[in-house]
Structures are given as structure tokens and as C-alpha cells.
A protein has these predicted regions:
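Serine-dependent protease modules
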Residues: 1-265, 271-272, 350-352
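C-terminal recognition in membrane/secretory proteostasis and scaffolding
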Residues: 11-12, 85, 235-352
Length: 352
């Protein structure tokens, strides 16, 4: 393949999806500026967007101002848009969607995924260009991918190219301006230039299909970005079609996927399964009181070894197995408590 042919593939992929990428502008009414923290345009906003809440002069009382921006992409011609939850996290904000042709629409947040950095936004429009959704389970390390989005909140529909650098990564990222941390497991790692502003935009393959949603970076690191696998979003879209909301099963515990390293470090009986344990957050609990897990009698330091008779493999998160189940399903768990094996069962609830 000569250089012309090599360049043609990403060029054609970008042409195919470019019309379906949107910018999302975040605006808020500022009732007072007393005590407010204002970020000059030349300094990055530590809350995650490099957009200043004022242009040269502070806002006056009651004025609506732009406080941030992100990206998204159209998945249905009637105005259904995928983006990141952290882009549209603020329930007090107003969201304006700017399509590739420069038209502006009021954006209504239809749903926010309770366990992933995914949100669905709706605009009132017809016959919009749509980006096809690929299959994120068929990705391979080294595969070429392309990110498109509202780079740094300033440069609309910027394009960058790279590869899939890793699969099934686990990260913790700040969600919104309140500093709440969200733990994302099973995300894609890429060396594509992902930054504040192009979060929520599509990560596409050379066929012009979205295989991920750009979501996070590691500040201070070069060429390390992360994306949500598109198959997670497909399930959310199916839920919205069926129920009008995103529905996720809830067991009610925190757990650590086990491997040989953790087995040796903590002198555990097994190198696979899910260790029920609280995390580092203040007031964290391993088992949520009153939850299905609590009613089943699961306790901190239990090791869950099997789910519905299926052994939990090494380095496998329990959440990945729960994704196969639905609200209202009975779940049978085998647990190891000290040296005693126990079998329990409970009914999954809807995560709120």
C-alpha cells in the first residue's frame, strides 16, 4: 500500500462521519458573582473545560454565560445524540447543540447512565446525518482509530488519529464540577489526542463506524487517553427504546477483581474471583445496607467465586458479569468466607 492509499482510508472515514459530529455548549445563569471563582481565558479551568466563564469582563448578576463545552454525535436522524455524562452532568445548566452546519438546537438530556460515563441528549430535528455504530468487541491492539470533537472547547470538529493501545483498562475520573469520582472499568486506551472539549465525541474505525466515546485523559501524561466501548452505549440506547430510561441492575457491593498479584499481596486463598471490600473514599462501605447483596448475607472480605454457576475468571470485574443480567433476575452466588464455601441467592434491583 502506497502513501496515497494509506492516507485515503482515514480521510474517507472522516468524511463519512464528519457531518454527524456535534458541539455541546454549556450555559448557566449566574445569580451573583460574589465569591465566584473566575478563570481568565489563558488559564485552564481545573473543572475540566478550557473555556472561560467570561470574555474580558465578569458577568453581571442574572446573566447567562457559557461555562463549558463538549462534543457528541448523532445516532438517530430524529436528533438522538450520544455524549459523556460528565459533559451534561449539571442539572442546573442549559445545553445548546451545534450541528456541523452551524445550526443551534436546545439540547434535552434524555438519560444519564448510572454506572458509565454515557449520556443521551435529544434535539428537535429531522433528517440529521447519522454515525453508524460498530462493534467494540472486535477491536484489536494496534488498530487504527480516529477521534473527532470540539478540541479544548475552542476548535470545532478537530480530527486526530492513533491506535488502540490497551483494552479493559480501569480508571477513576472526576465527574462534573463537584469533584465526585467515577470508577470506569473495561474502557479502551488509545494514544489519540483526547482533551477537554472533545470528550463525548466519537472514536471511529477506518470504516467510519463509532467504536467508542472519547471520555478521559491522564493529566500530565502524553498519548494516554480513554474511550467508552460503544457496545455499552448500544445497550443504553436499547433501554431507552424499551423503557424510556437507562436501566441497570444493582447488587449493592464494592469488589476488587482478583489476580495472582493480589493473591500474593494480601495472602488470599484464590487468584480469581471478586473480593468484597470498601474503597478509599470517606464513609465507603463494602456492602450497601438494605441492598440485594446485604439481604443475601454477603459480608466484607468475602470472595465471590461464581455467578450463576460460572466461575469468575482472573482479572474480571463482577460488573461485567452483571451486565448480562436484568433487573428482577435472580442471581446465585458462590462465596468463600475464610475457608467455608457458601451459596446464596438474591434478586437484582434497579440502580438509581
Amino acid at each position: 500500500m502506497d502513501s496515497t492509499q494509506y492516507d485515503a482510508l482515514p480521510i474517507e472515514a472522516v468524511k463519512k462521519v464528519y457531518p454527524g459530529v456535534v458541539s455541546i455548549v454549556i450555559s448557566k445563569f449566574m445569580p451573583t458573582i460574589q465569591g465566584a471563582i473566575l478563570f481568565p481565558p489563558h488559564l485552564p479551568n481545573p473543572f475540566g473545560f478550557n473555556q472561560a466563564p467570561y470574555e474580558g469582563k465578569p458577568p453581571t448578576s442574572g446573566e447567562k454565560i457559557k461555562v463549558g463545552g463538549g462534543s457528541g454525535f448523532i445516532v438517530q436522524s430524529d436528533g438522538l445524540i450520544l455524549t459523556n455524562k460528565h459533559v451534561v452532568f449539571d442539572t442546573a445548566a442549559e445545553y445548546t447543540v451545534v450541528t456541523n452546519d452551524g445550526k443551534e438546537y436546545a439540547g434535552h438530556v434524555l438519560a444519564r447512565d448510572p454506572i458509565s460515563d454515557i449520556a443521551v441528549v435529544k434535539i428537535e430535528a429531522k433528517d440529521l446525518p447519522v454515525i453508524a455504530l460498530g462493534d467494540s468487541t472486535k477491536l484489536e491492539l494496534g488498530q487504527t482509530v480516529i477521534a473527532i470533537g470540539n478540541a479544548l472547547g475552542m476548535f470545532r470538529n478537530s480530527v486526530s488519529k492513533g491506535i488502540i493501545s490497551g483494552m479493559a483498562r480501569s480508571i477513576s475520573a472526576a465527574l462534573g464540577t463537584e469533584g465526585e469520582m467515577e470508577h470506569l472499568r473495561g474502557v479502551l486506551q488509545t494514544d489519540v489526542a483526547i482533551n477537554q472539549g472533545n470528550s463525548g465525541g466519537p472514536l471511529i474505525n477506518l470504516n467510519g463506524e463509532a467504536i467508542g466515546i472519547n471520555t478521559a485523559i491522564i493529566f500530565g501524561a502524553q498519548n494516554i487517553g480513554f474511550a467508552i466501548p460503544i457496545n455499552w452505549a448500544k445497550q443504553d440506547l436499547d433501554d431507552i427504546t424499551k423503557f424510556g430510561r437507562i436501566v441497570k441492575p444493582f447488587l449493592g457491593l464494592l469488589c476488587l477483581p482478583l489476580n495472582k498479584k493480589f493473591q500474593n499481596q494480601y495472602h488470599l486463598a484464590r487468584d480469581r474471583g471478586a473480593l468484597v471490600v470498601r474503597d478509599h473514599r470517606p464513609n465507603s462501605v463494602a456492602v450497601v445496607p438494605g441492598s440485594p447483596a446485604d439481604r443475601a448475607g454477603i459480608k466484607e472480605n468475602d470472595i465471590i467465586t461464581h455467578v450463576n454457576g460460572e466461575e469468575i475468571p482472573e482479572d474480571t470485574d463482577l460488573i461485567e458479569l452483571l451486565k448480562k443480567l436484568k433487573v428482577g433476575d435472580e442471581i446465585k452466588l458462590t462465596i468463600l468466607r475464610a475457608s467455608q464455601e457458601l451459596k446464596v441467592k438474591t434478586i437484582l434491583e434497579e440502580r438509581k
